């Protein structure tokens, strides 16, 4: 039996008359690199907020790391990490101070915290920058530090929301190598991105359109399902369809 870190059944979220997510059925395995894709307004952000335990679903169920997002939201939040495209760093703090702060927020203290951070710093190559203020780091190093902060507590699941926006191609490539290292260690990675070359690096993808799940599978399976030539073609197709739907 697969070890599902995320499992949703008929998950639905309504804001007044607007249904943002319609009956989402989704499973994501431990150690999987999973892409959640779709045009703006497709329901990605609402889905992530529900899975983080920040927004309650209107109906349906979901578990993250074995805990119900409605009844065990606090336990869910202790087992996830989240990194936004702005990285969530404190510019006036040093690299080491940012790491210690986030580790403490996630409940790591004392020797356990220092041992975990030492291991993490070595893995992400941050040793030489521990005393540098975060605000003076380049985009690529901020990205690396943001990931280190989001995963300092060794979460079961980490959400990466447009993590490589505004970062040069070399830094993006290095970042994806780090993502796969995390996955090999058992951390499930859920990525949202508008870079379709990055989407094709995911092991599986889910496409949302106007709150509906319309495709799940490997990049090759998604391309075949939509009769397209690439994942980018699928994205453009859905974007145009959504724009036409809104216009009509």
Where are these regions (language model features)?
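Conserved catalytic motifs of ABC-family nucleotide-binding domains
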Residues: 154
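Catalytic Walker B motif of ABC-type/P-loop ATPase nucleotide-binding domains
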Residues: 158-162
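Conserved ABC ATPase "signature" region
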Residues: 100, 104, 109-129
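ABC ATPase "signature
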Residues: 216-217
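Conserved ABC ATPase signature
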Residues: 92, 133-137
